[in-house]
Design a protein with these regions (language model features):
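Hydrophobic, well-structured mid-protein blocks that either form specific transmembrane helices
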Residues: 96-136
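Acidic, serine/threonine-rich low-complexity disordered tracts
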Residues: 22-106, 143-223
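Bacterial N-terminal signal peptides
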Residues: 7-15
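Sec/Tat signal peptide C-region and signal peptidase I cleavage site
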Residues: 17-21
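A contiguous pocket-lining binding segment that forms or flanks enzyme active sites
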Residues: 131-149
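Positively charged n-region of N-terminal signal peptides that target proteins for export
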Residues: 1-7
Length: 223
C-alpha cells in the first residue's frame, strides 16, 4: 500500500504531536551481483515543519580488501504544504585514490550555490541556478518514497527528473530517470538509469532498493 505524503504527516501528527520529531533509522547491506560490498545507514528526522535526511555508507566484506570506499550524504530543509523543501545538501565520497566533496544550498525553490572539490574548471553547460523547483537527490527520493510521483533533481553534476510508477501487484515502485543533462563534461560516459524499491504495507521506508547505474545494479537490502 502506498503511503501518501499528506497521509504520512497526518499519522505523524497524531502519533507524535506537532512539537516532536519522528526519527527513522535503517541499516542496509549493499550488494553487487549478489556479493556484499558495503553497508548503508539511513537516518531521517522529520516533523511538520523540518526534516533531516542522512545516509552513511562504508565498504565491508572481503571485497573491501580490493576496493575501499566511504560516503556521507546529507540534506535538510523545511516542510511546507506537505512538501519537502531543501535548504542544504552535501556529500563526501572517499576511496584510496580520491576524495570528492559537494555542497549545495537552496533558496526560494532554486539552487542558490554550488561548491565542490576538486574544483571544476569548465563552465557550466546548464543554467542550473535559474531552474525552478529543483531539489537535491536524497530529498527528491525521500519525497517520492513518501508518495509523490515526480521530482526535479540537481545533484551538482547532473540535472534530471525522477518519475515514479507504482505496481500494486508486486508492491514495487519504479523510479525512472529522464531529461538527463550533465552540468559538466562526463568523460566516463556514466549514466544514472533508474531506481526500484519495495515497501512493506504500513511502513514509510523501503525494505529493498535497487539502483541501476552505468549498466550495473547496486542492491540495498534491509538488515
Amino acid at each position: 500500500m502506498k503511503l501518501g505524503l499528506s497521509s504520512f504527516f497526518i499519522i505523524l501528527f497524531f502519533l507524535c504531536g506537532p512539537a516532536y520529531a519522528k526519527e527513522f533509522y535503517k541499516e542496509f547491506n549493499i550488494k553487487v551481483s549478489g556479493i556484499k560490498i558495503g553497508k548503508l545507514i539511513w537516518t531521517i528526522k522529520i516533523d511538520d515543519t523540518y526534516y533531516l535526511n542522512s545516509l552513511k555508507l562504508k565498504s565491508e566484506g572481503f571485497m573491501s580488501a580490493i576496493y575501499r570506499f566511504s560516503g556521507e550524504y546529507y540534506s535538510e530543509g523545511f516542510v511546507k504544504n506537505n512538501k519537502l523543501n531543501p535548504t542544504k545538501y552535501s556529500h563526501v565520497w572517499k576511496t584510496k585514490k580520491i576524495k570528492k566533496n559537494m555542497e549545495l544550498t537552496f533558496k526560494n525553490n532554486r539552487l542558490h550555490s554550488l561548491n565542490q572539490t576538486p574544483y571544476e574548471k569548465e563552465k557550466l553547460r546548464v543554467d542550473v541556478f535559474n531552474i525552478k523547483k529543483a531539489k537535491d537527490p536524497i530529498t527528491s527520493f525521500l519525497q517520492i518514497i513518501l508518495g509523490e510521483n515526480s521530482s526535479l533533481v540537481v545533484d551538482g553534476r547532473r540535472v534530471y527528473t525522477m518519475k515514479a510508477t507504482f505496481n500494486k501487484k508486486n508492491n514495487k515502485t519504479v523510479v525512472d530517470i529522464s531529461n538527463y543533462s550533465n552540468l559538466w563534461a562526463d568523460h566516463k560516459r556514466s549514466k544514472f538509469e533508474k531506481i526500484t524499491f519495495e515497501k512493506k504495507s504500513g511502513s514509510p521506508l523501503p525494505l529493498k532498493i535497487n539502483i541501476y547505474f552505468d549498466g550495473r545494479v547496486f542492491g540495498l537490502e534491509q538488515i
